[in-house]
Amino acid sequence: MEFKLEDFFPLYPESLSNNSKTRFEIGSLDVINTLKEFTDNRLDAIEILPTKPGEATKHQIVIRRLLSGYTQFDALLLVHEMGTGKTCSAIQAIEQNLIESNNGLFLRTVQTTEGIDDFNFNKNCNNNYGPGLDGAVILTRGKTLMNNFMDELVNRCSTNYSSGNRNEISKTSKKLFSKFYSFYTFEIFAKTVKKMRSSEIVKKFDNKIIVIDEAHNLRLSDVKVNDEKIDVYGEVHRFIHLLTNKKVLLLTGTPMKDGPQEIASLMNLILPLTQQMPTNKNFLKEYFPSTEAPQETYELGDEEEFLKSGGEEMKNIKKFKAQVYGCVSFLKAMDSKVLKVMVGERMGSLKHYKVVPEYMSTFQSKAYVSAYLQDKRERGIYNNSRQASRFVFPDGTYGAEGFKNYIIEKRGRGGKIFRLSPSLRKEIEKRSSFKSVHTLTDEQKEFLYLQNINEYSAEYAYIIKSILNATRNGELSIVYNDSVRGSGLIVLTLLLELFGFVRNNGTAKMKKSYGIFSNETTSVREIRALQKIFNSDENMNGNIMPVIFGSRVIAEGLTFKNVIHEHVVPHWNGSETEQVIARGWRLGSHEALIKKWEQNGQVGKKPQLNVYRHVVIPSSLLSSEVSRREDDLSLVTSSSRGIMENREIKSIDLIMYEVSEKKDIAISKVLRCLKEVAIDCQLFKKRNEKDSSFDYKRECEYEKCLYVCDDNGNNLTKKNIVNYETIYFREDVFLMFAMLENHYKTRFVSTLDEITEMFFNNKVLTHSVTKQEIIQLLYQVVSNNIPIKNVYGYPCYLYENYNVYYLVDHIIPFPSSEDIFLAYYSKHPQLYVKTDSQESGKASGTNYYQSVTWFNNVLNDYYESLIPLAIKDLTTLSNSTNLVSKTQMISKQLISLPNDVQQRIIEMAVAARVLEIYCNVQNTLPPLPAQLSKEWIERNQKSVFCKKKTFRTIILDHYKNYYRIDGVDSFKMAIVWFLSDIVEERAKERCLYGSSLNLKSGYTARPLWNEWKICGKKERVRVEKERSLIKKQYETDLGYYGLWNPKNNEFCIRDIRNQTGKKDKRSIPSGKRCVNWTKPALTELAAIAINIPIPNQSVLPTLKEAMEEIKSNKELRNIVPKDNNDNNLLIKLVFWYKLSRNDICINLREWFDRNNLLVEDNSCGVQTKRK
């Protein structure tokens, strides 16, 4: 084979010079779609997420390889939705660089489903410095996000820094990661680098990965830090562009919040200074020329022009894509299995958003109109109107003024304490037609309080009533409000306390409590504690904390589980609103509720998330035609009721949503460009592309969901493996080596075909292994004399002879073809050899075999010593009077014994069965055959297997598939093959021959169970036939049968439909773990092939529900028979598909067992399988 020099070096697209107009040549990155290290990790719509700390998802592997020290990708904007694991993506990239730099000298931990031990493969490699960077600088918006990042680093995304305590970050962990990771908040970092000279910055921070978490929070504006104005964005921008050797990773799920122009400031952080994008108004003129999108603090009147314009149309798309080419990764989250319902109706100019309207009382409307007109006169921001729409205090004030008059604020031991003033409390508790509030029932008091609250806030009355109803129904709620003081969250939570709720600071599990998440009221430690309480399974039905209230703190970095109701007080930015909603709606967020619902037989409504976007509308003050009942607190509203006839007075909430929707459409145009031009577009397309039911909705950027990647790889069909074999084979080699070592735990000699088959059938590696990779691994192990621990735990070395790989217990300087016989001594180690000089008084020339103490003999003696103890324990269990209980206890105890001990117990039980005609508990011996001595019979009668027939019967029944006896009365032979069924190795079948009963002189004291010998070739052939007969019992027309391994309680399914006539063992399918079958395959097996009866018909979906599910699910559509006319089959398919794989497997195992199609098999669930 001819090699070229480039075959030994990794090849990636080269970046262009900084004088070029683009970072990479357009089209050059299409090669990414052909590289094995990336294509092996192409995403599907659904991925089973790893459960062990440190294990990476497929997209995280892609990101860490893109940012490897071997590539020229030195900056990426990660536009990854909430719930995709952006933090772990960053940590994986950092750890990859640390390993490549060899600065960390990490031990690689190898974990597989077989429980393989750690092995530091690096110790056999050269520790030269590699291309990776040697540290990381992490910038976050605040301490909460910083702590979240640290927690992910220690407890989830890596195993290199954990101290074992998952509840907090220990000093030990901080000491470990502080060697490589530096953490700063935006403001502190900007203040730090502002004081440093350029040369100092380069010296301290060069050769590092820079990660900016929630990067969209870096704004083009000054920020006050200790009364000092600092241009945070400018300092970070200067810092990044000073460094010469760095990689930059910007993390964000929402790169734009206030308008599409914000993408420019983000991209300029990572684009060279000569390729900077225009910002603010200049960006809008270039790409959205029809309007200037308003900022969050725009003045009154601006919204009219914006709403009338066509500002959501984007121009010069090709130019924009060229500027960001090679710098963007785009990923959407996997869809949650829980339905998200937008409650309400469309109002005003809204085309997509649904809102829930509430109508102000005359009192609140009067104050709101005053606030609105004041905002209009002052040409300021809408702060007064927004405060008045939330809550108006009894004296007509709102916001800061009303808060000062009616809210009592004190500083307590645990922080600030707030409570309602007596005057405000009195107004809420004032009686109506009732004599005294103290004589009211709880229902009457609730109605009275809500009626009075509605006078001051229609929105808060609605929210509180919803919370009360949800709490009674065992449902969790979240309330988001960006205003904390004034008429904001503090007032709302204090009003809720009138209904028996108490504030929880995270220190105790108080019933009917609430948590408040804001920087003004709650510390970072309290926020973490409150989140843990709220997300606990104990709280899934609100038994402790049924509701939490949050400001902007909850919009980023936090996840909330089992939420049923989310209330959103209006905000200018659709992106921020969506961030809040995503906190309680992501894959797995409702897992506990769904599981409970399924366990209860799917009775009642399936859990779903209800989202309420609240809009408060002022009542008419100018027309006597508009009337409304002041005591109407119904949660059912109508958009035609109570609308202001004075067109100058508008609902600020509705305006905010109208502006938000229009901005969101413009932002989505940019997001669509980023998705299509992303460097990983083709790799992530199956995940990012939704089905047509989402056409023209926000999920598909308000366009058709079907899209085409700019780099689609259509012209590149050949998979390129050069980079993978040069670099990334090193990553998988650790895991592959562990699998190889595990393979040799059950053998000392193995062929290349057997090793290849083992890797091809693996369920551990994330990609399919090639034969070249296997040979490369074997070559490295053999040529570098890398030790492999054998079954005894001794280090051995692997050698090869004509594709046969064998273990020897020492290094062979010059291997030869005859060395293969040395494997015998690895399998049978010598512990001690006696020399002639030590044999004083004995003749020299002693037989070598007799002079050696063999390891196997010592091991067998040890197992023999265990047998009496094991039998004693088993016979104790057999004293139970209940036969079923006795059998179950003995079977459970047998499984826990070493395999060799189990083999000996079977042999003793079989021998006792052979002697049954001679066993007599009453010591009344039957007539003896002439050749048997009385002493021999008495010795055998002492066996517990003879004395206790029931015990022996249980033993033999338990192992019924592992022995055979040819005739008892005229005994010929018995065979036991328990060990050979576990380890596919010769000389494991053991035979008891009829000749053993023909005793010779001198053997009269030897029990029959000591007469077992290794079977000959003829008997081994007989064993193979017996195995085939056992399997044939289960090979019915169905084409499947179940396997159960009692040792590890694994359940496998064997598919024998295409087995007929196959002689080559490699082509015979072995049993596959049930949980490793795909969901569609299990569904088809349960619903079509087997058609398992469903006992509880009430849990089945309706035909309409089934049709809708199949229509929206491609996997289900693919398993529906083409000629199907059976509606019941469609219902069954959906029913089984909705269950977890584990639940389907439980049902399948029970069915196989009931129908006598479940066979015990010790190879189920292990890598080494007999066929």
UniProtKB/Swiss-Prot annotation:
GO terms for molecular function: ATP binding; helicase activity; hydrolase activity. It holds the Pfam family SNF2-rel_dom. Gene3D superfamilies: P-loop containing nucleotide triphosphate hydrolases. A motif (DEAH box) lies at residues 213-216. Its EC number is 3.6.4.-. Keywords: ATP-binding, Helicase, Hydrolase, Nucleotide-binding. The keyword Acetylation does not apply. InterPro entries: Helicase_ATP-bd, P-loop_NTPase, SNF2_N. It is an enzyme of class 3 (hydrolase). Residues 510-588 form the Helicase C-terminal domain. The keyword Nucleotide-binding applies. ATP binds at residues 80-87. Residues 67-273 form the Helicase ATP-binding domain. SMART domains: DEXDc. Belongs to the IIV-6 022L family. SNF2/RAD54 helicase subfamily. PANTHER family: SNF2/RAD54 HELICASE FAMILY (PTHR10799). This is Putative helicase 022L. It comes from Invertebrate iridescent virus 6 (IIV-6).
